[in-house]
Structures are given as structure tokens and as C-alpha cells.
């Protein structure tokens, strides 16, 4: 590439939803009510996402089911 040119397209090895939301994936979720949760994916289906939620120290705090309609954004740790 010459100066000023950009490489177009997605990065090689970009993840797929099935992989990043697979059981055991670490994610951070922003809910529409203003809560941000971090945890490990237990399961997901057409209704929502089940997380094993962790506090800022990484300690488990319980399980949370989040309906898709309540989720604003899901951030995934680099895979």
C-alpha cells in the first residue's frame, strides 16, 4: 500500500456470532436500563442471553438472563 491508502474489508480471522457468544465466552453487556454486566456466556437462544456474571474483581455474583430487547451492546474480549 502507498501512503494514504487504506486496506479495505474486515480483518482476517474476524469472529462469527456463534463463536463469540459460545458457552464460556467472556463478554461485557450494556443493558438499556443503564447497567453494564461482565460475565461468561452460559447460553443464548432467540429470547436472550444467560450470563454467569462477574464483579470487577472477577468473582462470580450470580446468573442473569437478559432478553435481547434489553441489550444495547455486547462487547467481546479479543478472540
Regions found by a protein language model. Give the residues of each.
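Short glycine-rich, low-complexity segments
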Residues: 1-36, 50, 57-79
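Short beta-strand-centered aromatic/proline hotspots
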Residues: 36-43
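Ser/Thr- and Asn-enriched, surface-exposed coil loops between beta-strands
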Residues: 45-47
Amino acid at each position: 500500500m502507498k501512503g494514504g491508502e487504506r486496506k479495505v474489508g474486515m480483518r482476517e480471522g474476524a469472529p462469527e456470532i456463534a463463536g463469540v457468544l459460545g458457552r464460556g465466552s467472556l463478554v461485557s453487556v450494556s443493558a438499556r436500563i443503564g447497567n453494564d454486566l461482565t460475565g461468561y456466556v452460559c447460553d443464548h437462544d432467540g429470547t436472550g442471553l444467560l450470563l454467569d456474571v462477574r464483579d470487577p474483581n472477577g468473582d462470580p455474583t450470580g446468573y442473569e438472563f437478559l432478553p435481547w430487547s434489553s441489550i444495547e451492546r455486547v462487547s467481546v474480549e479479543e478472540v
